[in-house]
Amino acid sequence: MPHAHVSLITLGVSDLRRTARFYETLGFVRKVKAAGEDVAFFEAGGVALSLFDDKRLAEDATLRPEPALPDFRGITLAWNCESEDGVDEVLATAGKAGGRILKPAQKAFWGGYHGYFADPEGHVWEVAHNPHFPLSPDGRPTLPD
C-alpha cells in the first residue's frame, strides 16, 4: 500500500483567471504555465494546489455539476501561521485581493487565534495560529502524539 498523504488539492472554479490572480496575490507560486489556461497549478507548502474549471472537474469525476453551489460545501482549507500577526496579515491580504472575510481574526475556543475567508469562488479557508501545533521550518504543522 502506498504511503497515505495528500499530494494535490483541486478546487473547481468558474473563473480561472480571476481566481488564479487571487492566489498569486496571496503569495502562492504558480507553476506549469505550459499547461495552458484550462488549469492552474501552485506550490502550496508541500502539496500542490490546482484550479480547474468546475464543470469540467465534475465531468471528469463523473458527477453532475451543481447549478448553484451552496455557501458551505462541507470542507475548509487551512493556512497555519507562526503568529497571530501572520493571521492578521493573511486575512488582510485576502480581503484586499477580492476575498470575502467570513470571520475576522479572533481568539479561538481551542486556545489559538483564527479567522476565515472565502476566495472569489467561495472556497473557505481558515487562517490560524495554533500554539498546540508548532510549525516546522518548512511551514508544516507538527501534530502531537
Model-flagged regions — what are they?
Residues M1-S7, G12-A34, A44-R100, A118-D145:
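Glyoxalase I/VOC metalloenzyme domain signal
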Residues V39-E43:
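Minor-groove-contacting beta-hairpin "wing" of winged helix-turn-helix DNA-binding domains
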Residues W110-G112:
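Short, small/polar residue-rich loop motifs at catalytic or cofactor-binding pockets
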